[in-house]
Every structure is written in C-alpha cells, then in structure tokens.
Amino acid sequence: MTDRERPEPTTIQPVGRSVSRRTVIKGLAATGGLAATGGILAACSSGATPAPSTGGGETAAPSAGGESPAASAGGSITFGSNYSDDVPKNAMQAVVDAFTAKTGIEVAVNTVDHGSFQDQISSYLQGTPDDTFTWFAGYRMRFFAGQGLATDISDVWSEIGSNYSDAFKAASTGDDGKQYFIPFYNYPWVVIYRKSLFEEKGYSIPATWDDFKALGDRMKADGLVPLAFGDSDGWPAMGTFDILNMRLNGYDFHIGLMAGNEKWTDPKVASVFEKWRELLPYLQEGALGRTWQDAAQAMIGKQAGMYFLGTFAGEQASEADRPDLDFFPFPTLGTEFDSELGIDAPIDGFMVSKAPKNLEGAKEFMRFLATGEAQNIFLESSPNNVAAANDADTSAYTPFQQKMAEIIGGSGAIAQFLDRDTRPDFAGPNGMQGFLQNFINDPEQDLTAYLQTIQDFWDSLV
Amino acid sequence: MSSTPAPLPAAPGSTTRPRQRYSLLTRQDKLVLAVLVGIPTLIHVGLVWIPTIASVILSFSSWNGIGGLENIEWVGLENYQRLPSYPPFIPAVTHNLMWLGVFLLIATPLGIFLAVLLDKEIRGTRFYQSALYLPVVLSLAIVGFIWELQYAPEKGFINNVLGTTEQGNLIDWLGNRDLNMWAVLVAASWRHVGYIMLLYLAGLKSVDHTLREAASIDGASERQTFFRVVFPVLRPINIVILVITIIESLRAFDIVYVINRGLNGLELLSVLVTNNIIGEAQRIGFGSSIAVVLLLISVGPILVYLNRAMRDQPG
Amino acid sequence: MTAIARQRAVPTAVTRERRSRLPRALLHAFLISVSILWLFPLLWAIYQSFRPFTETAAAPVALPQTLTLDNYTNAFERMEGFKYFFNTIVIVVPAMAVVLLLACGIAFAVSRFSWRFNLALLMLFTAGNLLPPQVIITPLFRIYLALPLPEVLNDKGLWYDSYFGIAMIHIAFQLGFCTFVLSNYMKTLPKELVEAALVDGASVLRTFWQVILPLCRPPLAALATLQFTWMYNDFFWALVLMPTGAKRPVTSALNNLQGQFFSDTNLLAAGSVLIALPTLIVYFALQKQFVRGLTLGSTKG
C-alpha cells in the first residue's frame, strides 16, 4: 500500500508474450553460448562495474566463478509481478527478456495490478504462487518469511552478499537470521518541485521549518497551492506522518512505535499531529477525494508549488517535463534528531515462494536480479529509483537519480514506510489508513481521544 | 450482485389448481427426479448454506488465514465484544442505516410515485419508462464511475456548474465525509428508483380495473383512489418492495468499493467483511463476526419475504 | 400481464372526462424533466468519452471543439481488446445455461413431490438467494482454496482463481430465483400434458426434455436476459475469488483499470461506456424479455 501506483490497472502480461518465438530462439542461442563459456551470471565480485548490458543474448555474464548452477536450471520459471503501470511494466519486461536471453530460462510473467497484488498476497502465497514474486523489504517481508511462505535464499546471498551494503542485507533478513529477499532499488520520500517555477518566481530551497512555511506564504501570495496533496487511497498521508515523527522524535522512537514498543498515546505522538496542523494552511484542499496521481499532476501543471511524495511521482510527468523536476529533503524541524536526516526510502525487490516448481531457475533469476546489470536495465526505462546493488552503473544516472542516491546515502536513519514497518492489519484500510484520513478530515479533533482509539486498535490486534 | 431478484408473489385473484399425485413413475423415473432435485440442492446448499453456517462458527475463532484449520484458535465471544470499539464498525452500521433510510423514505416512494404516474394512459410512456429504467441495467460498479464524472473535484460536472473548483471554495463531494455518503446515495437512488418503478408498475397493471372505476364513479379523487383502494389491494407487492429495499440496502457494496474501497466516510458492513479477508493480513474470525451481524439483520426481512411469497404458493 | 394490458387498452370514458388539459401538460413536463435528469449522468459520460483530454482539462463543462474516438481506441487498447469480455463470456454463458437447466429440472421435479417438501425446498432456495453475498464470502473463500479442480479447468488446480469457480457461485446463488420463477410458471401449465405423456409410456426424462422444456421457452427467454445482465454486472465474486487480473471478467477488471484512467476522466468515461455497452444493447434489444423476467412471478395464472 505504500506503494507507488497503488490504484492502478491490471494489465496482465499474457504468458505467451514473453515466450515469443524470437525470444525462444534467442534463449536457445544464449544457452548454447553459456554452455560454451561455462560461465554463469551469479553475483559479481564486489566493486566490479560491468559494462552496461549491450543487449546481446550471448553476452557472457560476469561470473563469481565457481560452479554453474544454471547449467542444470534451464526450463522455465513463473514470476508474479506487481509492476502493472506502463513504465515499470515495460522496464520489468526488459529485465526479464535480458534474463531469458542470458540463461535460456523462460519467464512467464503474471502481472497483477499493484493494489490487488498486495491485497491478495496472503492467499496468493498460500495457494499456488508463482515461483518468484515481487515484494517489499521490512516487516512485510519478515512476516511472510516467518509464516514459512518464502524460500530461504541465504545460499544465493552468500554469493551476492558482497554486492550489497550491510543495510540492504539487514533489510533482506528474516527474524530467523536467514535471507529471503533480493533488494532491487529504492527511492526516497522528498519534496518535489519544478525548477522552472522556482526560477521564474525566485524561490529558494527551504532548509528549516520556518523557511518552509515562509516559502508557503509566498506561494500563496503568488496564487499557488504550496503543497499538493492527495490521500484518497489512504496511504500517501503515511509519508507525512513518518517524516514528521522521525524529525521530531527520532528514528528509534518511530520504529519502536511501529513495532508496538512505544504507545500511540505517548505525548510525543500528539506532537506529530500538532506539527501537522501547522502544515494544513499550505496543503491542497480536498485531499481525501484526490488520488496521488492527480495531486502530482497539480504540481507538474504548476498549480501547486511542491509535492511531498516518493520520487515515483516523476512517473506522472511527460518526457519533456521530467528534466524540469527536482527535489529537496523535507526541512529540519530544529530538534536533536535533525542530524539523523531520517527519511523513508522503501526498498522494492523479489522473493522466492515456498515451493517453487523450478527452484534452481528461481534462484538463478534472483542472482540475476541482484546484479547491477539487471537493475540498470530497469532504471533505464524507469529513472525514478536508484539501484540497490553496489556494482550498478551510476554514471548513467540522471541528475535526479544522482541526487536521490546522495540523499539516501547521506541519511543516517532509513525507514521503509509506515505500512512496511508495521503489522499489515494495523496499517490497512480499517487501521492507519482510516485513522489518518480521519485526522485529515477533522484535524482539530481532540488528539487524546483520537490517539487512544489508535492504541485500542493496536491492542485489539496483538 | 447487481439486483435483488424480485419474484413477485401471485397477483391478487389468481386461481390455484388442486394438485394430484401420480403413481405412473418407474423406479428409473424416480431416480431421475432425485437427480434433478439433488444436484441443484447440493450446489446451493454446498456453496451458500454451508458457508453461511461456517461464517457463524468461524465468528467464534481467531485465525489469520495462514496454515490449515488446526491453526484456528477458539476465542468465544471475543470478536463480538470487540465490535463496538472497532473504529469503522459504528460508522458502517450508521451508513447502512442511512442507506436504508434514504431508500425507504425517498427512493422507494419516488419509484412508486413514478409508477403511479406512468400507469395512466399517456403518450410516450415507453420513453419515460425506458429512461427511468436505464440505470438498472448498468452494474453498480459502472454507476460508481459514471457518478465520479459528476462529482470529481476539479473536472466534475457539478463543481464546474456551481463554480466550486478553486482552492478555498472547492466542494469535495467524494472526499468530505460529511458529504460523500449522501453523494453516493444519490447515485444509488438513481438506480433504485427505476427498479422500484418497474416492479410497482407491473403490480399496478395487475389491479382489477373495475375497482378503480367504481371508486372513481363514487366521486373519489385520484389520490383517494390510490391510497384507499389501490394501495391496500397491492399489499403483497408492497411487502415485496419493502423487503427488496431492505435487502438492497444491506447488500450495498460495489459503488463505495469502486469509489474509495469503502474508506473515509463510506464504510459499510459489507466492505468491512471484505476488507478483513482480502488484504495482506486476513482476520477470518473477526471478519466472520461482522458477517454474522449482517446475517442477523438480513434474517428478519428474509422471513417476512418467505412468509409472503410462500403463502401465495398454490398448494 | 399481457392479458391485463390488452384489456386496459381501451380507457374508460369516465377517467378520460375527469382529466383536464392543464394537469396533463404538467404531468408531461414533470415526467420529461425527470427523464432528462435520469438520462443526464449517462449522456454526460458518453459526451465526455468523445472529448479529447486537453479540452476537458481546459474547460470541463463546455461545448465541444473537437470530438474524437481516440478515447475509445485508447481504452480498448489498454483493456487489451476483447480479453476481459472474453473472460466474461467464458463465465457467464455456461453459468447461464447450467442455472436455467438445473432450475428447470428442479422446478419440474418438485412438482412431483409432496407439497410440504416442495415448499421447504423453495424456501431454502429463495432465502439463500436473498442473503448478502458478504455473509458467505469468508468461508467460501477458504472453501475455494481447498477444493481441487482438474488442471484442464484451472492451471492452479483449485476452484479459487478459476472461471469454473466463479461460474459455480453464480449458479448456486441464482438457482433460487430461477427455480422460484420456473416452478410458478410450471404450475400454470395444464397438468394433462404431463399426464398424457406419462400415460403414453414416456419416461420422466423424456417428458422433461420433450414436453416441459419447450413449453418453458417464454420464461426461459426472460430469465436468460435477466441472468445475463446480472452475471455480467457482477463485481464482487471475481473481486474476491479471482486474484489473477488477466482472468477477471470485464466488470471486475474495470476496478483495476481505474487507477490508470483516474487522471484522465475521458478515458474513464470511454471505458465505462464500452463496458456498459453489452448490457445496454441487451436491454434495448430485449427490453420486453427483461421486464417480463423481473415481473414473471406476478404473471402466472
């Protein structure tokens, strides 16, 4: 629900499409090539920056050396994907095609729209899931791993581990200390704006809360809505809660609250909503009836000056407008936690289901997805994220991406996002989604009673 | 479910025929008859009644839906005790009641009123009927979309006509929780009125004509004729329409689900049940307890309906 | 109903005399305004569906400068052509045929049993038909996850996520209404027909096929029209029981198309009109059947 493209289309990839005759032939050729070289894509040795994929099926993969698990793999695997919007869907297809070209393993992609995929993840994983599937790091990954619904891929990690930072490894590790997840990319939640608008009006980037509000006042005087806002889907408002809580109360308190170690009735939480009230005069009205896509359009269309959202908002911009988008981190609030630079930067990635029909093929796919090469292919078509692997080629990053990498790298406290950091039933439509909408609808309500309701709901779940 | 089916009971004055039993049946014939009855009964009971009973049983349990039945934990009445403090529960009940109130007090009477008007011999009655009835053939999901085009904040028809599309005076029809349920009810009534109109019109057509003429000759006004003569005669149909109105109010789901998945002021019991099973974390037991509440409310009108419909069954 | 309508075709002099011209004009004025009000939302959707996005964005309520079919081609493309319509057909046509056949069978058979049994069965079916679907969905969902299905019918080998499963729940739910209507109808058939057939030595099955079924053509036609519309319009069952987006019938799939369409209301309008089209066509072509289906219970005798 965090996630990007929440309300969006089902566009299912017909299984047959990815198995067009052309790819089959290419795949066969690739298998031959691989057999000849004996090399297999696996993890790359750390730091190595492979040449960006040149597209040829016969390109030998960087090899971590050693055995060749793929030689026995072959065949085909299935892949449940939630990349259903046009841009990421095509990007994912390019990754899959490159994998097939490389290994000869056919991938049948089952694309389900983002929202439905998440809603049905539990029954999907218990029923007859695809061999591999897209998912998110954090509590949400650990929950399903803990229920035995995912395959332990620690052996894959032992090969690819050096290609990731410790933070990524930790985010991929279940409660039992084993790894279940391959990080693919992440993206920060930041304040996005159009450079041309800021230049035209002579606005400067606000660093502190007061600067931020002063800028908002100027924008209002200029007839702009300072901050675009849309929360009809329930989750975008969580980003605002997260950032205010981390900046006011610190990362540790935020994560503790998500895990249930802190209470919602704590006055610290009330202070978050009090701060939120200060933002209200600057926020776009009618947020509860507006999707994030429409809110992004308001910022891109220059009716609104700024928009606090994940960088995926960039997907809403046309090709021509995209270079004009820029962003800055949420301003500091003048607390002891300012130096943490806490931020939401959710990680998206992949898992292997509990009993894949083709385990070797699935692991092979995981190894491929853990390469900078695969991540570069994806980011080429969808430059609104940054790659997770160390060996990803960052030289091709747009300035937008370089800045994302900088902000994430500069943060000392990275959270995943409210609905990835806490229990799904607590974060869901009848829980936090509804509670935050309730606050937006009536921000002046009595906070004591409001927060007590939230705490009671938490208590009823555990 | 798009519409509650409406088998109207026998029209007043229909004749029934005494039934005879036959004994011309061979053993094979009896077997065939048993199969003809058995298969549909099996399907219906298996997929409708067994789940209904299971809903009741599961409502005493706690289960996140993962693993087999052995993972079910029995918690007695705990789910029910938690219902009143479950934040969306009271709003959902209130909204279902609002839905019922609007249907009963506005939509259904309007449908009846239109049926009475259309029952006169007037020119173009077919056009009027078709226009009013048109929304009924649309799915409730499509009805939701069509009305979103009316209610959308910046691009919707209504706000543009009212001139309320600007920051400061924007009317957020579907987002403001003081407004959105009423906005949805307009859309739902748009469909319900036509449905009731059609059913009632059929009922009116079956009223013995001489009754009205007699009243008319006695000097009764049209209104008097309707309320004193026609309406009482149509009692069976009135009851059916009442029941349909209640059941439709309890079934309400599709429109709010396509608008915002039943959040933020559009909570309904049916949505709460659904959200507890589709979602990342299933709360099977708790969701079932809400389903049981829905069941208990439905039982009353269903019994009234059965009583009515079956009384008219020829013996 | 038809008989009554015919009877009423000649209005009596008394009623005609009592009506003056003015109220009649008022009545028409009222009915015309209500009709326009009723048609407006749909007409607006149709109008929007022909306008280009840029024009609507600039001036949502305005006379058109250009009208285009682009929204339709675009919507059709994004809905991947007939895919979802095909899913609907695969579910609805067999479900409709089976439910009518089964309902005919049981309606015929119960008329051979004791009255008490007959009534009990009818009550069970009708009550089931009236339940809100959400009352049964939670256990049904688990049952569907547990019931096996040959791989021919569903590659996942379960009722869950299969066309078959969706068709079955439609059948189970709609059986009540169809049985009720058909059993009422059959009671109006002359008993002598069945008796004569049986006396002639025809088996029950033959009597059913060759005597009863042909006689039931009128209610079957009406029920088929109605069932098509209801099953086509169903949103809920597939939403819960069919997780694979590509297999969903068109009405449920629409929900997933919404996100894509949301910022582009013209596209949303075109998508809605496209999806509403089959039911509108059925309605206009078979209006009489449609209305008869809904009111069948009252027409017997």
Feature locations, PLM:
Chain A
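Extracytoplasmic/periplasmic solute-binding protein
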Residues: 63, 180-184, 189, 213-261, ...
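C-terminal capping/gating helix-and-loop segments adjacent to ligand/active sites or protein-protein/ligand interfaces
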Residues: 174, 257, 384-390, 403-459
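Mature extracytoplasmic/periplasmic domains
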Residues: 150, 155, 301, 312-316, ...
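Extracytoplasmic/periplasmic substrate-recognition and gating elements
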Residues: 97-102, 200-201, 274, 281-284, ...
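N-terminal secretory signal peptides
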Residues: 1-20, 30-43
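Hinge/lid segment of periplasmic solute-binding proteins
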Residues: 136-189, 213, 240-242, 326-328, ...
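Extracytoplasmic "Venus flytrap"/periplasmic binding protein-like
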Residues: 98-165, 196-207, 298, 305-306, ...
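Glycine-centered hinge/linker elements that transmit conformational signals in sensory
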Residues: 218, 258-288
